Amino acid sequence: MRAATKGTAMRKIVFMMSVSLDGYFEGPDHDLGWQLISDELHGHFNEWLATAGAFLDGRVTYELMASHWPTADQDPAASAPVVEFAGIWRDMPKIVFSRTLEQAGWNTTIVREVVPEQIAELKARPGGDLVIGGSVLASAFWAHDLIDEMRLYVQPVLLGRGRLLFQPSDVTLRFRLAEAQPFADGVVLLRYERLRA
């Protein structure tokens, strides 16, 4: 693939995740049932994700998505946003970072580890932004300061326990609030851009 031409903005690595008010992305026993995903919010997800250049996932996130989305639009009870996203997911190029996954379908490439030089090359290619949707993979990207933007969908709930979105770290990273958008169900998008010296 061709690198981005001079004067063309390099595409970004964007971390997208729903999070509770007290900082959890997952409840006890991997519970995600507390997340409010209205048709309005799902439509918003679809509009933005359709512009992406690729989805970047770890093995667990990829296998979760691959177990549902390839045929989700065949369910007669599926809402219009669900039907739309099934097509987006199938068609979107996907990169799975995994040391153990041997095969992956649905327009998916397997990469064994996060190598900063390879990520820089990926960002320099033309196309839409690259979207990370899993916390473990995001941690590997944070370790190399590779994430350019966060899209946090803050859910109006206190979970009390579960898996925290951000693990303890000795590194301080600063961000600029680029957008705040409330939705009717009480979810708020907070979009932050990484500030680099």
Residue ranges, per PLM feature:
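Enzymes that bind and transform nitrogen-containing heteroaromatic metabolites
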Residues: 1-197
